[in-house]
Amino acid sequence: MAAHGGSAASSALKGLIQQFTTITGASESVGKHMLEACNNNLEMAVTMFLDGGGIAEEPSTSSASVSTVRPHTEEEVRAPIPQKQEILVEPEPLFGAPKRRRPARSIFDGFRDFQTETIRQEQELRNGGAIDKKLTTLADLFRPPIDLMHKGSFETAKECGQMQNKWLMINIQNVQDFACQCLNRDVWSNEAVKNIIREHFIFWQVYHDSEEGQRYIQFYKLGDFPYVSILDPRTGQKLVEWHQLDVSSFLDQVTGFLGEHGQLDGLSSSPPKKCARSESLIDASEDSQLEAAIRASLQETHFDSTQTKQDSRSDEESESELFSGSEEFISVCGSDEEEEVENLAKSRKSPHKDLGHRKEENRRPLTEPPVRTDPGTATNHQGLPAVDSEILEMPPEKADGVVEGIDVNGPKAQLMLRYPDGKREQITLPEQAKLLALVKHVQSKGYPNERFELLTNFPRRKLSHLDYDITLQEAGLCPQETVFVQERN
């Protein structure tokens, strides 16, 4: 049985040697040697023989010679490795095995096959711009959307979005997450998606382990993949963020975004606007305090410069000027002060001015006092310019009713009233006047005490909670204060 098995193996070996010699034209001894080196694998022996140039040394009959040749033949077994390398550098990679890709050295070329792209560009030039849409390799299936991507940094992408008036769409890719690869394969390759991105967005794709990707992840606190977001290129504000997307959901989400925010053209497509915030009396108190302080300072300076002239006036003129503030100079100043009063009025322009009937109504008591004046004084009085209607004075006839029994020549309290409609009014009352006088004055302006309350901001106090019989001085409203009129809660 052993002899029969040995003869069968010998005949099989002879058959292989005969086939080897027939294919290669080598001698039987060379064929036997190559088959022994390749463990009787005819295909490998023929390949190794041809790779070696078709030349093989005759094996020696001595055992020592065989032992020296065998290590050499063992090295020859490694010959197929260059064959694999040869496929990797095949000049036509579309017909070879996929290439082992080099590490990404750029923020956008992690999956790019530059050689394939060069061939594609040459084909496009030869075909007059036509693109071969047949995907022949796995690399083509998962290739990034090179034609859509902005090839630059995050900052250059924002600048490009500002110049082209387009939103900035960010795609962070994680090569370890297959869902991210599916975005390249399914979503970014869709023609409808490409069209809407080209029209409205600057598309910036970056890999999570790149320098730019790490910086973006650290700043915008990214946690889940796949990741797609839309930013305002002018401010860098993240407007929306999506994770699980297919073609239909992407188109729905983007359509909804554009319907809400529009195009970035500065008109209907302006970025998400800040909520229009109604002007609050308390929020504006700091500005009003500053204005009141400046106005009071100007009035005090002006009062000192004209006190000498006022002393020479008649008693009747003095009585008509007891409650005058910033406008007392309108009724008594000559032409020397007209320019200064006019400049002061022009410098206090406000967006809330009411130049209608109320302006004339509030100015009337000041322009028609029952006083005796000489012709020169009357001329000056009638020729004075109009003053800001928002800085008003309590008319003397009204003041007489609320300050009976009080020394009207004593110290005054200058109050700036801020109404809910944005209008301002400055009044002057004696320090010993009751708080009730102020409440009645506000009621006369159409703000009843049942619905509206008075308060100050620094310190914050609700005057409506105080005793109305206390004086303005006791209420802490002297020498000047800003009082806000607001609706009760």
Swiss-Prot record:
Name of the protein in its database record: UBX domain-containing protein 7
Compositional bias per record (Polar residues), positions renumbered to this chain: 59-70, 300-309
InterPro entries on file: Thioredoxin-like_sf (IPR036249), UAS (IPR006577), UBA-like_sf (IPR009060), UBA_8 (IPR054109), Ubiquitin-like_domsf (IPR029071), UBX_7/2 (IPR017346), UBX_dom (IPR001012), UBX_domain-protein (IPR050730)
Description of how the protein assembles with itself and partners: Interacts with neddylated CUL2, ubiquitinated HIF1A, and VCP/p97.
Modified residues (Phosphothreonine): T306
Compositional bias annotation for Basic and acidic residues: 352-366
Recorded consequence of changing S288 to A/D: No effect on interactions with CUL2 and HIF1A
Compartments it resides in: Nucleus
Crosslink (Glycyl lysine isopeptide (Lys-Gly) (interchain with G-Cter in ubiquitin)) position: K99
Source organism per UniProt: Homo sapiens
Residue ranges annotated for the UBA domain, each copy included: 2-54
Glycyl lysine isopeptide (Lys-Gly) (interchain with G-Cter in SUMO2) cross-link, chain position(s): K84, K134
Single GO MF annotation: ubiquitin binding
